[in-house]
Amino acid sequence: MNDGSMGPGRMSTGSISSGSIGADSLVVGQVVAEAEFSLSRDCLVRYAGASGDFNPIHYRDDVAQSVGLPGVLAHGMLTMGIAVQPVVDWIGDPGKILDYQVRFTRPVLVDAAEGAVVTILATVGALDTETNVARIDLTVTFGGVTVLGKAQVRVSLA
């Protein structure tokens, strides 16, 4: 298990075989992947360096609280990125992602000592057998609460 000190750590994961996936081998409602990622404050600082987003609400409690936030928040794009990773792992090729959209509904608070655990469940939301495209719906939660709304990934199954 990765404690998240080097980056978002995958704590557990599962997916159906991504061998030769076609729309005819899937059903709406089927779970295709699930994962948990641990985030630490170190992850946030490293992500800030990679992204260039050094807003101190992502690493300083005093600044976050001074602007009315309950604590340090994970970067939205970091949350969005880790949320799609189980789908990329399942489909086997990031180039098969045709579209990815989310709504940010709640922040992920990253405690200085305990960090945060983000849970992702990916299910088939719709299938188009003519184009061999699937819509994968993501349920992304932190502390049992959904943090990304209408998180959907369109993937090519060809």
Which positions does each model-derived feature cover?
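Catalytic strand-loop segment that frames the active site of acyl-thioester-processing enzymes
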Residues: 11, 16-74
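Short, charged/polar low-complexity linear motifs in solvent-exposed/disordered segments
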Residues: 51-52, 64, 98-100, 116, ...
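Amphipathic, positively biased hydrophobic alpha-helical segments used for protein targeting
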Residues: 34, 40, 44, 59, ...
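Hydrophobic residues in beta-strands and at strand termini
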Residues: 39, 104, 155-157
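HotDog/MaoC-like acyl-thioester-processing domains
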Residues: 1-6, 11, 18-32, 110-158
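Residues that form or immediately flank small-molecule/cofactor binding pockets and catalytic motifs
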Residues: 37, 107, 129
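Hydrophobic beta-strand-centered segment that forms part of the acyl-chain substrate-binding groove
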Residues: 70, 79-121
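Short loop/turn segments at connectors of secondary-structure elements within structured domains
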Residues: 74, 96, 130-132
